[in-house]
Every structure is written in structure tokens, then in C-alpha cells.
Amino acid sequence: MKLLGAPLSPFVRKAVIVAAEKNLDYEYDPRPSPLGWPEDFEKINPLKRIPALLPDADKPDFAINDSSAICAYFEKLQPEPALYPSAAEAYGRALWLEEVADTELANKVGMLVFRPVFFNLAAGKPADIAQNPKSPCGVCIIRYSS
């Protein structure tokens, strides 16, 4: 089993944490990143998003893409310890909270930190350190220098 994706991605880290909790063995490839895609990555995920999981080396054409799908696969592969509740209402709520974290929270953090700071620095540009006027909290990004 091979997990692909940049270690700074919160979605990759989510899959890594679930794999660790499930005590799953896997190979890790950090190369796929929005800053540079391996030549063959589009065959694995045509959308070029991370993480991606290749569950079986003997089936290179089968990939699971999206952190929630990967975590659900891990849950079925190794049911214990259970990371999702078994009761229907609690399970539905857990899936909803996961979706809120994946879409709303990740988008806000990405807009405030990853895009203006890490992506700029990785591309050799200065970090864009300014108060974000769209932030409802008036969050300021603190200067990061290497």
C-alpha cells in the first residue's frame, strides 16, 4: 500500500494519522504536491489532488483519491480501533464534522496561511504578510522568515 502526497497538506496528514491509529503499514511518497507533480501522477488522480492511495502494488490502475475516501477505506480494512461511531446519528454527525473540517476549515486556513506564506516561500517569493480583510476575526499572519 502506498500513500502519496505532500506532508504539509492537512489532508495527507489526516490520512497518515488514521493509518497510524489503525497500525497500518504503508509506503509513503511525498513527491506529489501543488508545487510539482510527478509525471505519472495524473494517471493516479486526473484531478491532481492529494492525498492518493495505491492500495495494491499488483493493481497500479486502482487508486483511492480524497482523504475521506482513504480514511473510510482504512476503517473497512482495519475495523479496530473504530474511528467512527457505530450509532447511525453519531456516525452521520461525525461524517458531517469531517466534511466541515475538510471544506470550510481547510479552505480558511489555506487562504490565511498556506497560500500566502508557504506557497510563496516554496516558489522563491516573499511571504505575503498582511492582515486578511476577509477574515471575520481580523486574523493577521505573523511574518515567517527562513
For the regions a protein language model found, what residue spans apply to each?
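Amphipathic alpha-helical packing segments from all-alpha helical-bundle domains
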Residues: 130-146
